[in-house]
Protein backbone atom coordinates (compact mmCIF):
# COMPACT_ATOMS: atom_id res chain seq x y z
CA UNK A 1 0.00 0.00 0.00
CA UNK A 2 1.43 3.35 -1.03
CA UNK A 3 1.60 6.00 1.65
CA UNK A 4 -0.02 9.27 0.69
CA UNK A 5 0.94 12.54 2.38
CA UNK A 6 -1.66 14.30 4.47
CA UNK A 7 -3.74 16.81 2.57
CA UNK A 8 -1.89 20.10 2.21
CA UNK A 9 1.55 18.61 2.95
CA UNK A 10 4.18 18.00 0.34
CA UNK A 11 6.03 14.72 0.21
CA UNK A 12 9.74 15.05 0.86
CA UNK A 13 12.38 12.62 -0.34
CA UNK A 14 15.57 13.38 1.57
CA UNK A 15 18.62 11.88 -0.07
CA UNK A 16 21.13 12.43 2.72
CA UNK A 17 21.03 12.17 6.46
CA UNK A 18 22.19 15.37 8.11
CA UNK A 19 24.14 14.93 11.34
CA UNK A 20 23.72 17.99 13.55
CA UNK A 21 26.81 17.50 15.72
CA UNK A 22 29.60 14.94 15.57
CA UNK A 23 29.04 11.95 17.84
CA UNK A 24 31.84 10.43 19.84
CA UNK A 25 31.30 6.69 20.40
CA UNK A 26 33.46 5.03 23.04
CA UNK A 27 33.53 1.26 23.48
CA UNK A 28 34.47 0.21 26.99
CA UNK A 29 34.01 -2.63 29.45
CA UNK A 30 32.50 -1.69 32.78
CA UNK A 31 31.63 -3.88 35.76
CA UNK A 32 28.02 -4.58 36.70
CA UNK A 33 28.55 -2.49 39.84
CA UNK A 34 29.11 0.61 37.63
CA UNK A 35 25.53 0.33 36.34
CA UNK A 36 24.20 -0.31 39.86
CA UNK A 37 25.99 2.75 41.24
CA UNK A 38 24.64 4.95 38.44
CA UNK A 39 21.10 3.72 39.13
CA UNK A 40 21.46 4.21 42.90
CA UNK A 41 22.80 7.76 42.33
CA UNK A 42 19.94 8.51 39.89
CA UNK A 43 22.44 9.10 37.08
CA UNK A 44 20.89 6.26 35.07
CA UNK A 45 17.12 6.06 35.25
CA UNK A 46 15.05 2.90 34.97
CA UNK A 47 11.30 2.78 34.60
CA UNK A 48 10.06 2.09 38.13
CA UNK A 49 6.34 1.59 37.49
CA UNK A 50 4.52 -1.73 37.30
CA UNK A 51 3.65 -0.98 33.67
CA UNK A 52 7.28 -1.36 32.57
CA UNK A 53 7.84 -4.23 30.22
CA UNK A 54 10.09 -6.68 32.06
CA UNK A 55 11.36 -10.13 31.25
CA UNK A 56 9.71 -13.11 32.97
CA UNK A 57 11.67 -14.54 35.95
CA UNK A 58 13.03 -17.54 34.02
CA UNK A 59 14.47 -15.29 31.31
CA UNK A 60 16.00 -12.98 33.91
CA UNK A 61 17.50 -16.04 35.61
CA UNK A 62 19.02 -17.27 32.35
CA UNK A 63 20.55 -13.84 31.78
CA UNK A 64 22.15 -13.89 35.25
CA UNK A 65 23.35 -17.42 34.49
CA UNK A 66 25.29 -16.03 31.50
CA UNK A 67 27.11 -13.71 33.88
CA UNK A 68 28.09 -16.58 36.18
CA UNK A 69 29.25 -18.58 33.16
CA UNK A 70 31.39 -15.58 32.15
CA UNK A 71 29.84 -15.54 28.67
CA UNK A 72 30.17 -12.19 26.84
CA UNK A 73 26.90 -10.28 26.64
CA UNK A 74 25.82 -8.06 23.76
CA UNK A 75 26.68 -4.39 24.06
CA UNK A 76 24.60 -2.08 26.16
CA UNK A 77 24.28 1.32 24.48
CA UNK A 78 24.13 4.48 26.58
CA UNK A 79 24.03 8.13 25.63
CA UNK A 80 25.65 10.62 27.95
CA UNK A 81 23.73 13.74 28.87
CA UNK A 82 25.15 16.86 30.47
CA UNK A 83 26.10 16.41 34.10
CA UNK A 84 27.30 12.80 33.72
CA UNK A 85 23.77 11.39 33.50
CA UNK A 86 22.96 8.61 31.08
CA UNK A 87 20.06 7.31 29.00
CA UNK A 88 19.82 3.69 27.93
CA UNK A 89 19.52 3.48 24.15
CA UNK A 90 19.60 -0.31 23.96
CA UNK A 91 19.86 -2.96 26.65
CA UNK A 92 17.30 -1.70 29.16
CA UNK A 93 16.09 -5.26 29.89
CA UNK A 94 19.62 -6.37 30.71
CA UNK A 95 20.30 -3.39 32.98
CA UNK A 96 16.93 -3.75 34.70
CA UNK A 97 17.55 -7.49 35.23
CA UNK A 98 20.96 -6.84 36.80
CA UNK A 99 19.43 -4.25 39.12
CA UNK A 100 16.46 -6.42 40.08
CA UNK A 101 18.80 -9.32 40.84
CA UNK A 102 21.00 -7.04 42.96
CA UNK A 103 17.89 -5.86 44.82
CA UNK A 104 16.85 -9.54 45.34
CA UNK A 105 13.54 -8.98 43.56
CA UNK A 106 13.52 -12.49 42.09
CA UNK A 107 14.92 -15.95 42.75
CA UNK A 108 17.06 -17.75 40.19
CA UNK A 109 15.03 -20.46 38.45
CA UNK A 110 15.45 -22.95 35.60
CA UNK A 111 19.24 -22.65 35.45
CA UNK A 112 20.74 -25.20 33.06
CA UNK A 113 24.49 -24.88 33.54
CA UNK A 114 25.16 -23.34 36.95
CA UNK A 115 24.48 -25.49 39.99
CA UNK A 116 24.12 -24.60 43.63
CA UNK A 117 22.44 -21.21 43.22
CA UNK A 118 19.09 -22.22 41.72
CA UNK A 119 16.26 -21.03 43.95
CA UNK A 120 18.40 -18.32 45.55
CA UNK A 121 18.19 -14.54 45.45
CA UNK A 122 21.20 -12.24 45.48
CA UNK A 123 21.07 -11.62 49.24
CA UNK A 124 21.38 -15.39 49.85
CA UNK A 125 24.64 -15.75 47.93
CA UNK A 126 28.05 -15.87 49.57
CA UNK A 127 30.52 -13.01 49.19
CA UNK A 128 32.48 -14.75 46.42
CA UNK A 129 29.36 -15.15 44.25
CA UNK A 130 28.19 -11.61 44.98
CA UNK A 131 31.58 -10.22 44.00
CA UNK A 132 31.69 -12.35 40.86
CA UNK A 133 28.38 -10.78 39.81
CA UNK A 134 29.41 -7.21 40.71
CA UNK A 135 32.80 -7.50 38.97
CA UNK A 136 31.53 -9.07 35.73
CA UNK A 137 32.51 -6.79 32.82
CA UNK A 138 29.78 -5.62 30.44
CA UNK A 139 30.53 -4.45 26.90
CA UNK A 140 29.19 -0.93 26.60
CA UNK A 141 29.11 1.66 23.85
CA UNK A 142 28.82 5.20 25.13
CA UNK A 143 27.53 7.90 22.79
CA UNK A 144 28.62 11.43 23.53
CA UNK A 145 27.63 14.53 21.64
CA UNK A 146 29.97 17.34 20.75
CA UNK A 147 31.81 18.27 23.97
CA UNK A 148 31.99 22.05 23.39
Annotate the PLM regions.
Residues 31-39:
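Flexible hinge/switch segments at interdomain interfaces of large molecular machines
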Residues 2-9, 13-28, 48-148:
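Basic- and aromatic-enriched surface patches that contact anionic nucleotides/nucleic acids
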Residues 38-41, 45, 50:
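A structured, charge-rich N-terminal accessory region that forms the first stable segment of a protein
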Amino acid sequence: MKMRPLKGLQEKNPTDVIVKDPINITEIKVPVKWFLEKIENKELLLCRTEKCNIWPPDKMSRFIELIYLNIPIDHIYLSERKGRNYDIMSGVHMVRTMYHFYESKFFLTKLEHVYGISGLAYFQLGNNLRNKFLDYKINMKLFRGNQK
